[in-house]
Amino acid sequence: MSILINSTTIGDIIIVSGSVLLLFILIKTFAWKQITGIFEAREQKIANDIDTAEQARQQAEAFATKREEELSNAKTEANQIIDNAKETGLAKGDQIISEAKTEADRLKEKAHQDIAQNKAEALADVKGEVADLTVLLAEKIMVSNLDKEAQSNLIDSYIKKLGDA
């Protein structure tokens, strides 16, 4: 029985080996191009997918870089706008201060002119009163012959009237 098993086993091995060899020959003859075509198509699809993914990654990186540049430019522009606003505000403040100083100087000069005019008018009024009092004093002195004491009293009262005026 062991010889029978051995010869059956060898026969089975030969038949199976022949069948496998025949199968490979048939596959090579009839289906090899389709099978390799499927593998090549699959390889090409994977390569295309990798290329597409690489392009998408590069586009995403370019987009991210562009957005970062735009953000940086926006920040720079915002800082410039803020700086310009500060400068404009300071210039406007300086202008307002300058205008206020000019107006204050103008008002001060006008006040000085008004004071000088009022002083001149007051002096003119005082001169008029002094002239009137002088004439009145001279008339009194001429009308009456006064002695020295009476003249002195008259002059003192004249000076007192000038002080009151």
Curated annotation (Swiss-Prot):
Q: What does this protein do?
A: F(1)F(0) ATP synthase produces ATP from ADP in the presence of a proton or sodium gradient. F-type ATPases consist of two structural domains, F(1) containing the extramembraneous catalytic core and F(0) containing the membrane proton channel, linked together by a central stalk and a peripheral stalk. During catalysis, ATP synthesis in the catalytic domain of F(1) is coupled via a rotary mechanism of the central stalk subunits to proton translocation.
Name the principal localization, coarsely classed.
membrane
Subunit structure as annotated in this protein's UniProt entry = F-type ATPases have 2 components, F(1) - the catalytic core - and F(0) - the membrane proton channel. F(1) has five subunits: alpha(3), beta(3), gamma(1), delta(1), epsilon(1). F(0) has three main subunits: a(1), b(2) and c(10-14). The alpha and beta chains form an alternating ring which encloses part of the gamma chain. F(1) is attached to F(0) by a central stalk formed by the gamma and epsilon chains, while a peripheral stalk is formed by the delta and b chains.
Q: Which CDD domains match?
A: ATP-synt_Fo_b (cd06503)
Molecular functions per Gene Ontology:
proton-transporting ATP synthase activity, rotational mechanism; proton-transporting ATPase activity, rotational mechanism
Instruction: Reply yes or no: does the keyword Calcium apply.
Output: no
Membrane-protein topology: Single-pass membrane protein
Membrane-crossing ranges are 7-27
Query: What is the protein named?
Result: ATP synthase subunit b
Into which family does the record put it?
Belongs to the ATPase B chain family.
Q: Which InterPro entries match?
A: ATP_synth_B-like_membr_sf, ATP_synth_b/b'su_bac/chlpt, ATP_synth_F0_bsu_bac, ATP_synthase_B_chain
- Would the keyword Metal-binding turn up in this protein's UniProt record? no
NCBIfam families, from UniProt? ATP_synt_b
Short name of one Pfam family for this protein? Answer: ATP-synt_B
What is its subcellular localisation? Cell membrane
